[in-house]
Amino acid sequence: MKKVLFVGESWHVHVTESKGFDTFSFDYYEQATEYIQAALEAAGVEFHHIPSHLVEERFPTTAEGLAEYDMVLFSDVGANTMNLPMNVFQRLIPTVNKLELVREYVRKGGAFVMIGGYLTFQGIQGCGCYKRTAIEDILPVTLLEGDDRVECSQGLTPVVIDSVHPVMAGLPEQWPAVLGYNRLLPKEGSSVVARIGD
């Protein structure tokens, strides 16, 4: 059975409500993994999830640990979450570069997928921060500077360009509309199998 390591798609929300003179705050946690988990498990894939706030303690820090998985997926998790653990950020202690570890994993035959979102590719206000990282090296696209999001509240439907490409096996030719995407440029030699927007 294939094993997939899915990283991200989780968040904590802090809310402050003001009601006249009075205010109060509350927090809650959410994650959005149910659809992709169900799809992968239906295809016979063993699904392992690391929420964003647990990357520091759970993401593999060795090539051997990462090699236990057939594929690594990043979804809405920023480069800072991957590469600024507390030992680096607060204590100035060098540690493993997780993004370089993923690049080496791919160079040795591992599969990597980045799913678009507010904190992947460059994301909202450029906060995804993957430009000029080891991850950009292994992606088949070039990342833009700054905020790469295109919000389309009217919905846009991706157009399949190469339906016979192996990655498209089992996928319908007509896709549902999306409400936003990350604008990216294909690298020379990359196969473009679908396109959206300009």
PLM segments and residue spans:
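Short alpha-beta junction capping motif
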Residues: 3-7, 11, 64-125
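Conserved beta-strand termini and adjacent loop/short-helix elements that scaffold enzyme active sites
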Residues: 7, 50-53, 195
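Residues that mark the start of a beta-strand
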Residues: 1-4, 46
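A short, well-structured beta->alpha microelement
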Residues: 41-64
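Glycine- and acidic-residue-enriched helix-capping/strand-helix junction motifs
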Residues: 14-33
